[in-house]
Amino acid sequence: MADAKELKQVLTGPIINNNPIALQILGVCSALAVTSKLETALVMTIALTAVTAFSNLFISLIRNHIPSSVRIIVQMTIIASLVIVVDQVLQAYAYAISKQLSVFVGLIITNCIVMGRAEAYAMKTPPMMSFMDGIGNGLGYGAILLSVGVVRELFGNGSLFGVEILSKISDGGWYQPNGLLLLPPSAFFLIGGLIWLIRTYKPEQVEAKG
């Protein structure tokens, strides 16, 4: 049984020390697409965290009974089943957001973070540690999404969660929204800036030359 210190490290490690987007460069595609609004970024974070945590848990529970030759198929079946459940829940209780997220919830099935943790961690680790690892990686993914989402929605539309923060000129205020921040390429540059900041703060994460 893992002790509290180990569980804490597994839970918090992926947020800064081994962030799946900023340091492993995984899950970038969805980060570019769903961060124009903080609301969609938050829902995507919750969806991916739930899928990663529970897929890790279920795969870890049966890891000793999965033949090596079909392990990827088993992993994808479990992940796909969880994604379908999440998608149906979103359509039932948050239909408008589900429409905004479009295909990106379904594409969690092939998300590198989910697949990577299932194969590299859950297949070799007890259930509780695997579950916490899934939550930790989901939170790490969410930390980047929400950071980018705040900048894009605040300065691109003058609002957060749809609530006006900066009064727009068109409404008699002072702020002129920067429409470029609402385009997917802006997220690419913002994520690049976050990667630079994190690697400046943690130089040990920079790959050795030569």
Curated annotation (Swiss-Prot):
Protein name: Na(+)-translocating NADH-quinone reductase subunit D
Gene coding for it: nqrD
Gene Ontology terms describing biological process: sodium ion transport
One of the record's GO cellular component terms: plasma membrane
Catalysed reaction equations from the record: a ubiquinone + n Na(+)(in) + NADH + H(+) = a ubiquinol + n Na(+)(out) + NAD(+)
MF terms (GO), sorted A to Z: oxidoreductase activity, acting on NAD(P)H, quinone or similar compound as acceptor
Source domain of life: Bacteria
Keyword Transferase applies: no
Function (record text): NQR complex catalyzes the reduction of ubiquinone-1 to ubiquinol by two successive reactions, coupled with the transport of Na(+) ions from the cytoplasm to the periplasm. NqrA to NqrE are probably involved in the second step, the conversion of ubisemiquinone to ubiquinol.
Main localization, broad class: membrane
NCBIfam families associated with the record: nqrD (TIGR01939), PRK09292.1 (NF006777), PRK12405.1 (NF009070)
Membrane topology: Multi-pass membrane protein
Keywords: Cell inner membrane, Cell membrane, Ion transport, Membrane, NAD, Sodium, Sodium transport, Translocase, Transmembrane, Transmembrane helix, Transport, Ubiquinone
PANTHER family in the record: ELECTRON TRANSPORT COMPLEX PROTEIN RNFE, NA(+)-TRANSLOCATING NADH-QUINONE REDUCTASE SUBUNIT D
EC number: 7.2.1.1
TM region(s), chain numbering: 14-34, 42-62, 72-92, 96-116, 131-151, 178-198
Subcellular location: Cell inner membrane
Subunit structure: Composed of six subunits; NqrA, NqrB, NqrC, NqrD, NqrE and NqrF.
Source organism (scientific name): Shewanella frigidimarina (strain NCIMB 400)
Family the entry assigns: Belongs to the NqrDE/RnfAE family.
